[in-house]
Swiss-Prot record:
Region feature Disordered, mapped onto this chain: 1-50
Subcellular location: Cytoplasm
Coiled coil: none
Cysteine disulfide partners in this protein: none
Species whose genome carries this gene: Mus musculus
The protein's name: Uncharacterized protein C4orf46 homolog
Length: 111
């Protein structure tokens, strides 16, 4: 059972079955179906604690945000490395330009 909890915590959250703007409205006060909660008066079987459901969704979101932060940090490091290489290349090209200009100027006849 611990394995299924680990798998559940590491997998991304499933999309909600329906959105609040789907046009389906209920005349009675019940828990939102779009969050995966069950209305005990409508369906038999075990109900999902809304707090537990929200905690699971927060955990899944935190996991996803952590992965996104790791990926962003990796890309940031690559961008910094690329910027350093571009700066080195610009310095190299400027040096060559200056050398070529000096060589060209030295070939001009003196007046």
């Amino acid at each position: 059972m611990a394995d299924s909890e680990e798998f559940r915590a590491s997998s991304p959250p499933p999309p909600p079955p329906s959105s609040p703007s789907s046009g389906a409205s209920s005349s009675s006060l019940s828990m939102p179906v779009s969050l995966g909660w069950r209305d005990p008066s409508r369906s038999p079987g075990p109900t999902v604690d809304p707090l537990e459901q929200v905690e699971l969704q927060i955990g899944d979101a935190a996991f996803s945000l952590t992965k996104l932060l790791e990926a962003t940090s990796a890309v940031s490091a690559q961008v910094e490395e690329l910027a350093l290489k571009c700066t080195e290349n610009a310095r190299f090209l400027k040096t060559w330009r200056d050398l070529l200009k000096e060589g060209y100027d030295s070939l001009k006849p003196d007046n």
